[in-house]
Every structure is written in structure tokens, then in C-alpha cells.
Amino acid sequence: MEATGTDEVDKLKTKFISAWNNMKYSWVLKTKTYFSRNSPVLLLGKCYHFKYEDEDKTLPAESGCTIEDHVIAGNVEEFRKDFISRIWLTYREEFPQIEGSALTTDCGWGCTLRTGQMLLAQGLILHFLGRAWTWPDALNIENSDSESWTSHTVKKFTASFEASLSGEREFKTPTISLKETIGKYSDDHEMRNEVYHRKIISWFGDSPLALFGLHQLIEYGKKSGKKAGDWYGPAVVAHILRKAVEEARHPDLQGITIYVAQDCTVYNSDVIDKQSASMTSDNADDKAVIILVPVRLGGERTNTDYLEFVKGILSLEYCVGIIGGKPKQSYYFAGFQDDSLIYMDPHYCQSFVDVSIKDFPLETFHCPSPKKMSFRKMDPSCTIGFYCRNVQDFKRASEEITKMLKFSSKEKYPLFTFVNGHSRDYDFTSTTTNEEDLFSEDEKKQLKRFSTEEFVLL
């Protein structure tokens, strides 16, 4: 009886936190963001310059866009469509209870897990759909209607679907391969893309069996001493994402892996080994890899000398974003203009959407408006992500990133490095992972160290 009373108190507490959180952040979501027409805007390796939106696609040299072979003029609508097409993952409420707790929301503590999900989602978008893909309905999302993004309206989206369900919901991730699903649409490119689009979002659903959903990520976090309701930092989330992808058994995910840099060092042979690992299918191609590099951009505060480095990273075609934020808040950084970073904010709490339902609503998984913040406000602790489709792509990326690191760094040493060979060649002990424990002892030590260094999340 006492336990029941405690659960009720916890539920009331979470409802209050969600309501307070939305009151705090909803005005931010609805506030207009202003962009200059005189400076280029970079979004995950694509350059837009609104000053030339009515002109030819070739920009003049003084425009500021210098990404070879990837320069586009792009008008405002093209930029909006590109931004809105990125997958937005936020706090949710009223989802199935997290095992071992009374929590049915991540409001107040799950923001870095959400920004990590957004980075991984962008990597999967590149893997399955490519950087040129945009959601056809992106511009149908209106940000001017202040009611559009309230929790009440989100419930309207799901109400019609709930009416079709009887009895207790079953939360499950479809096991049919994407290739099987889209087979009959092989001549319909748009249908193929839409199937992948929905499938990727479903992998991040807030149900226990969603491959990269909050419930699963928390389970992997338990192996490092984390639990639901704890604060997670960018480096810890990087390792959790790696484990989630490694453990995913979905046939469509056997061609991608994640590598997490050790002590700001990417060991080229270790990455290539992961990409060349035997695949479960008949496809003998190299695996794609998402490289995650946890770094600190200074001591207590971000060193402004790293501004050009961050801008250089976000200008690369290989970049899938940065898990970062400002003190007490985690954001997903996806671009910049001048000295301001462009980001997506996970702090707005939306209602649970059951992604196992056919044609579930997509609107709440796409952010209607970009936000900007000064680089000076950025917390120094962050994790940078890159995507490479195969071994050759990785080799090109490592060369290009190394050049960028040298040119953008005012420090004597680059923020991170690519080195030839394996980590074991540099006196790192290679530990075999216990089958009963997803994290090795070395990984646990790393995770505990990272968790004490990183900022507190709201």
C-alpha cells in the first residue's frame, strides 16, 4: 500500500516537472531565430547563402562557402527543408514504464540521451538515405501556430490510433527486413525513402524493444552503473550508443558499426578492423562506421580558440553533428552561422507516440525551427560524430579531418588525432569482454571517469 502511494507521488511529481518544463521551454521553441543574409550558413556539411538565393547555384569566392564540391547556394526554403528533415528526438511523457523504476518520462534528466539519439539518427539517415535526402512534407510543418507543439495537440495526433487498439498494447519492433518491405516498391524511389524514414524513427521509439529507444539505452547504461533518472554526459552516451549498435540484431543494421575514440585518439587499424569484420549476410562489402570522439574544448569554460575547429568540423560532409550543449543543458549541434551554433533542443516534453502503429504521425519527430546560441556559451564537454560509408571513405575522411585539425587549431597539439596502427601497439591493454557483461573493466573505468568530468544535465 505504501509502495502504491509512493508511485502515485512519483507520477504526480513527473507530471508537474513535465508541465513546468514545457512552460519554460515552449516559448523558446516558438521564438523566431534570425539569420543574416550576409553570411553563409553551414548545416552538416552543406553551405547555404541566403544573399544569393535568387541567383545561380555557383557562389562567388567571397561568399564564405569553401567546401569543395559540396557548395550550394540554396535559398531559405531549401535550408528550412533540410533542417526540418533532420530527426528531432525530445523528452517524452506517458511512455511505458522504465523497468526498475516508476518513471514514464525522461523529462529533467534524459536530454543527453536524446541528443545522442539525434546524432545516431543522422548517421542512419546518411547510411540508408544519403545526405541529399529531405522529407517531402518538411515544409508543411508550421511553427507559427503556437498550439502546434503543445502536449495537448500531440495527444490529438495519437488519439485516432489509440481508438483502434483493444486490450493491452504490445510494443514491438518489426523484424521484417527493410529490403523485404520495400521490394514491391523497388521502382518507386519516394516510397522506398519513406519506408526507411519511418523505420529509422521507429528504432528510436519510446518502448522497451525499440533498438535505440530510451529504454534500451538505459539498460546498456546500467552496465556502467547508470540508472533511469541519472545524468548522462556526452562521453558516456557515446559508449552506450556503441553498445546499442553492436547488440542490434536487425538484418538492416549489420552493415554499420560504431567506433569510440580512446583518449582523443582514433586508431586507424582498429577502425578498419571494425569495418572489415565478417558480416552475417552474403554481402561482403565493408561496413560503414560512425566515429564518435569525446573531447573537451577547454577547462571550466570553452576556449574560444576552438571556435574555428568546431566550425571546421560542422563544415565537413562526414559530420553527423555534435552531442554538446551549454552548462546544465544538452543540445544537438548541427551547424553554424558566424560565431553562433545552430542546434536542436531536446528539452520540450511531448507525449508518447506508439511507433509500432502503421502510419504513426511523424510531425513531432521533426523540429519546425532551428535555434542559435553563441559559441562562447558552449560547455567544453562534447562528443563529435563522423560517418564513413566504407574503408576508402574512412581513409579519405581521416586525411581531410587531420588537415582541418591542423589548420583550425591555435594550440600546439590538435584536439584529437588519427594515428596508424592498433591501440594495442601503443601499450593499451586489450581486454576481452565478458559475455555476461556488455562493458569491459577498462570501459567501466572510462565511463566512470567521464561521468565525473561532465556537466550536470537538467
From Swiss-Prot:
Regulation of its activity: Inhibited by N-ethylmaleimide.
InterPro entries: ATG4_LIR, Papain-like_cys_pep_sf, Peptidase_C54, Peptidase_C54_cat
SUPFAM superfamilies: Cysteine proteinases (SSF54001)
Keyword Cell wall biogenesis/degradation (UniProt): no
GO biological process, one term: protein processing
Keyword vocabulary terms for this entry: Acetylation, Autophagy, Cytoplasm, Hydrolase, Phosphoprotein, Protease, Protein transport, Thiol protease, Transport, Ubl conjugation pathway
Residues bearing the modification Phosphothreonine: 452
PTM annotation (N-acetylmethionine): residues: 1
Pfam family, one: ATG4_LIR
Reaction(s) catalysed (UniProt annotation): [protein]-C-terminal L-amino acid-glycyl-phosphatidylethanolamide + H2O = [protein]-C-terminal L-amino acid-glycine + a 1,2-diacyl-sn-glycero-3-phosphoethanolamine
EC number of the protein: 3.4.22.-
GO terms, molecular function: cysteine-type endopeptidase activity; cysteine-type peptidase activity; protein-phosphatidylethanolamide deconjugating activity
GO cellular component term, pick one: cytoplasm
Compartments it resides in: Cytoplasm
Active-site annotation: 111 (nucleophile), 345, 347
Enzyme class: hydrolase
Entry similarity comment: Belongs to the peptidase C54 family.
Known function: Cysteine protease that plays a key role in autophagy by mediating both proteolytic activation and delipidation of ATG8 family proteins. The protease activity is required for proteolytic activation of ATG8 family proteins: cleaves the C-terminal amino acid of ATG8 proteins MAP1LC3 and GABARAPL2, to reveal a C-terminal glycine. Exposure of the glycine at the C-terminus is essential for ATG8 proteins conjugation to phosphatidylethanolamine (PE) and insertion to membranes, which is necessary for autophagy. In addition to the protease activity, also mediates delipidation of ATG8 family proteins.
The name this protein goes by in its record: Cysteine protease ATG4C
Originating species: Homo sapiens (Human)
Upper lineage: Eukaryota, Metazoa, Chordata, Craniata, Vertebrata
